[in-house]
């Protein structure tokens, strides 16, 4: 077992997103999902006509495949056959982007293309680390908290 996956299984690898999920490759994107008890995992998406392509399992239980035709914003899911023989279509737990409801597909995304706008906040944190102050965690499921009159969900910007 690799050191990183050992830390992942122990709950202490805080950078698993750098390995698992969909990541740019020299040609296309490489997809990885941890499913140690799965009998079989396939990758299906816009880039292969939703025809599941067999993924390859390593000794850590990580299934991987590089899809040469995958591009940013392509939708995809993992087709997982569990130890019980049942097959389910699953979203990527490490996806950087997802469909808007009611869709549940994961979407290919390249974080290097995102324009971050948090420079002022990062400077403030460098000068005054937030870990030295109080912590407040408020959890809310935005989709069930407030909606438009027609029942559709508000965007993050509308809720802000």
Where are these regions (language model features)?
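The feature marks proteins involved in alpha-glucan
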Residues: 1-30, 50, 54-139, 144-151, ...
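Short proline/glycine-enriched turn/loop motifs at strand-loop junctions of beta-rich domains
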Residues: 34-41, 48-50, 71
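Short beta-strand elements bearing conserved aromatic residues within extracellular beta-rich modules
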Residues: 41-43, 76
């Amino acid at each position: 077992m690799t050191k990183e996956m050992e830390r992942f299984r122990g709950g202490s690898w805080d950078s698993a997103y750098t390995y698992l999920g969909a990541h740019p490759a020299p040609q296309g994107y490489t997809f990885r999902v941890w499913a140690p008890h799965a009998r079989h995992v396939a990758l299906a998406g816009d880039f292969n006509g939703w025809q599941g392509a067999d993924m390859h399992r390593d000794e850590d239980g990580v299934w991987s495949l590089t899809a040469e035709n995958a591009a940013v914003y392509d939708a995809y899911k993992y087709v997982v056959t569990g130890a019980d023989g049942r097959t389910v279509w699953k979203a990527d737990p490490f996806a950087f982007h997802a469909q808007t409801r009611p869709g549940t597909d994961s979407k290919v995304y390249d974080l290097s293309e995102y324009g971050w706008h948090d420079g002022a906040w990062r400077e403030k944190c460098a000068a005054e680390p937030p870990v030295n102050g109080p912590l407040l965690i408020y959890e809310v499921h935005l989709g069930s908290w407030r909606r438009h009159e027609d029942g559709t969900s508000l965007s993050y910007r509308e809720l802000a």
